[in-house]
């Protein structure tokens, strides 16, 4: 009987992981959208053009990386879980 429960629990975990991973491609769509709308300056070989293109690309990469940073969201979620469990620890006496 416990093996049936274990199999059911494993199937449930796999289903949740599959659903969670299916929700992730929005970042890839945003990435493609940003890269398709990039208006880099035509490269004429000058240092100024190369610098502008570099800085613009660096800004885009920074935005994409900031979207992937979930540590901040997890920290906030943990804080609010603590507040829901023990309001005194968050808001004082």
UniProtKB/Swiss-Prot annotation:
Q: Which residues form a coiled coil?
A: none
What disulfide bonds does the UniProt entry report for this chain? Answer: 83-90
Alphabetic keyword roster: Cleavage on pair of basic residues, Disulfide bond, Secreted, Signal
GO cellular component terms, alphabetically, are: extracellular region
Q: Propeptide at which positions?
A: 24-61
Q: Where in the cell is it found?
A: Secreted
Signal sequence annotation: 1-23
Instruction: Please give the name of this protein.
Output: Allatostatin C
**From what organism does this protein derive?**
Camponotus floridanus (Florida carpenter ant)
């Amino acid at each position: 009987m416990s093996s049936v429960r274990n199999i059911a629990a494993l199937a449930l975990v796999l289903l949740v992981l599959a659903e969670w991973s299916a929700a992730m491609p929005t970042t890839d769509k945003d990435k493609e959208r940003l890269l398709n709308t990039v208006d880099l300056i035509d490269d004429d070989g000058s240092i100024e053009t190369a610098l502008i293109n570099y800085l613009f690309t660096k800004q885009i990469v920074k935005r994409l990386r900031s979207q992937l940073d979930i540590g901040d969201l997890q920290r906030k979620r943990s804080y609010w879980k603590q507040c829901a469990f023990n309001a005194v620890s968050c808001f004082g006496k």
